[in-house]
């Protein structure tokens, strides 16, 4: 939520201001925090990227050559980067042993369930893609949260929506809300064509016809 403080949309920088706000609200020092949890598992995401590029090779080589240096620099050493930033923020923060990495969809589900007033709930998460999962169903009971069902990449409602965002001329991972705002003013004239793209099963799962997409190769 750093953008709420920096006023920079999609601010990718280390969330120093957001962390300071939370610590002040809880009347804590950073060195007093028991656990710090990052929202995804970089190594599993890296595994997906490698497996996908290998599966579709030689297509996507240009995307691969651009993505790998960034991942190696910024993602594979994420724990060390986080520790250094946290240490700069609080000189009393001495160890990285309380830094953990959560499954991306479990992070989504946790942020919805634990602040809620419910003791028990079913949590549906659908986004572009986490490590491998694109859609998950989880059960929350008390302090426990368990993922029960998953749909994996490349079959993704989020990526389908981003494909439409791109097709209509908006920026992916930024302009989706504009498309959502425009949607009520449209008519379902392409419904039959869209039904050819996505196959929805009786149990609610789905598959996308990959002949219409190239996001697996960048």
Cite the ranges covered by each PLM segment.
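Short acidic/glycine-rich loops and adjacent helix/strand connectors
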Residues: 1-218
């Amino acid at each position: 939520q750093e953008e709420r403080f920096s006023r920079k949309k999609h601010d990718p920088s280390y969330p120093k201001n957001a962390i300071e706000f939370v610590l002040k609200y809880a009347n804590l020092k950073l060195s007093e925090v028991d656990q710090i949890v990052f929202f995804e598992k970089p190594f599993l995401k890296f595994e997906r990227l490698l497996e996908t590029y290998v599966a579709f090779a030689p297509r996507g080589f240009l995307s691969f050559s651009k993505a790998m240096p960034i991942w190696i620099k910024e993602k594979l050493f994420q724990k060390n980067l986080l520790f250094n930033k946290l240490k700069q923020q609080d000189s009393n923060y001495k160890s990285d042993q309380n830094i953990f990495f959560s499954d991306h969809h479990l992070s989504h589900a946790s942020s919805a369930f634990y602040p809620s007033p419910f003791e028990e709930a079913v949590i549906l998460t659908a986004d572009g893609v986490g490590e491998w999962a694109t859609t998950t169903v989880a059960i929350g009971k008390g302090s426990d949260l368990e993922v029960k069902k998953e749909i994996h990449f490349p079959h993704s409602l989020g990526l389908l929506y981003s494909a439409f965002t791109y097709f209509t001329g908006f920026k992916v991972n930024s302009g989706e809300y504009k498309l959502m705002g425009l949607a009520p003013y449209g008519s379902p004239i392409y419904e039959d064509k869209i039904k050819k793209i996505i196959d929805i099963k009786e149990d609610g799962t789905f598959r996308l016809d990959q002949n219409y997409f190239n996001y697996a190769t960048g």
